[in-house]
Amino acid sequence: MQAEIIAVGTEILMGQITNTNGAYMAKQLTALGIDSYHQQVVGDNGPRLEEAIKLAESRSNLVILIGGLGPTPDDLTKQTLAAHLNRKLVEDPDAMAKLQARVKQQQRPMTPNNQLQAMYPEGADILVNRVGLAVGAWIVNGQHTYVLLPGPPKEFVPMVDHELLPRLAKWSGHAEIMVSRVLRFFGIGESQLVTDLDDLIANQTDPTIATYIKDHEVTVRVTASGATEKDADAKLEPMIGAIMDRDGQYFYGYGDDNSLAKELVKTLAANDMQITAAESLTAGAFQAALGDVPGVSTYFKGGFVTYSLATKAAFLAIDARELAAHGVVSAFTAKAMAEHARRKAAADISVSFTGVAGPDTLEGQPAGTVWIGLARRGQLPEAHVYHFPGGRNDVRQRAVMTGMMLALRALQA
């Protein structure tokens, strides 16, 4: 049995985005003992995609196509494969109902290109999209089996884990159940984490370990097999324990769809506490990230964006002379912002951000210098200084995530 992966997308072909999906899929095939000797990348072009499919058929009996299932005119994968197999596209009622609900919620009309997301080649088995709208498919056609998977990683990974891997295990004669656990880490680079886990990775058999980096955090996927889910879980626990023994101080939560913001809101809920923030260089990004989490309004009533010294003094009632004396980029300002914001919002915990996003220096401090303040009810405020690498947006994003990690650890203490 041989599998071939075809990544579809002009952005991948042009080097604008990295083909992380192909690497992830290849690791899963290896874990199942399925040989894969070739991968292809094809742009959003129907004729060239069909050529790639024909080439894959000539040397593999499992063809996995990733990407091109969305609603835009250049999303041609399912149409191209359906035409190649001489099958029409039919509608999945469940996917269409989900799509209609989304369209209604957004108060916009249903368009034919949107409807395509709920279509699949006739005779295929549906692979449910737990995150997005475009359905995947498992298609058996003679001696070949074809798989359609969405391109966005947040949709692709859950579909592979929950929908595809059980089918692949059966298809390959791998009778055991595969179970994966995703561990999320922040504050450590992938290279350092891999170094820390070097012997575990080098000696892995079952469970297997795979690491990924995205948006300044690292995820570790640990996968084990067993006759039952309980058996697989029993294999996972010692490996997860070994990982946590080495890098547990950077761990913040489990799950594909988790985030620091979600984990922070969950912990606020568990403690029945409210949070606020006072932001300078991050310009409200911390509060915006909190606002993306459903149900946050119970634990976050509002906050402050105080970019200039004058607004810090006016909105937060901080003595302007003290601010001028210590400077914007200082421990004093970070502490004062956090504590005054907490008092004004009557919150239990508060985070503040002040510093130099760049590219220019400020008060003699280089770009990337960030002070983050933390204030808790009944405790003295504290401030932490960081020197983040990267451009302006990277500095701001790292600051927001670091502030979330600080607040999370304070709530867990």
Curated annotation (Swiss-Prot):
Phylogenetic lineage: Bacteria, Bacillati, Bacillota, Bacilli, Lactobacillales
Family label: Belongs to the CinA family.
Gene source species: Lacticaseibacillus casei (strain BL23) (Lactobacillus casei)
HAMAP family associated with the record: CinA_B (MF_00226_B)
Intrachain disulfide bonds: none
Pfam families: CinA, CinA_KH, MoCF_biosynth
Superkingdom per UniProt: Bacteria
InterPro entries per record: CinA, CinA-like_C, CinA_C, CinA_KH, Competence-induced_CinA, MoaB/Mog-like_dom_sf, MoaB/Mog_dom
Protein name per Swiss-Prot or TrEMBL: Putative competence-damage inducible protein
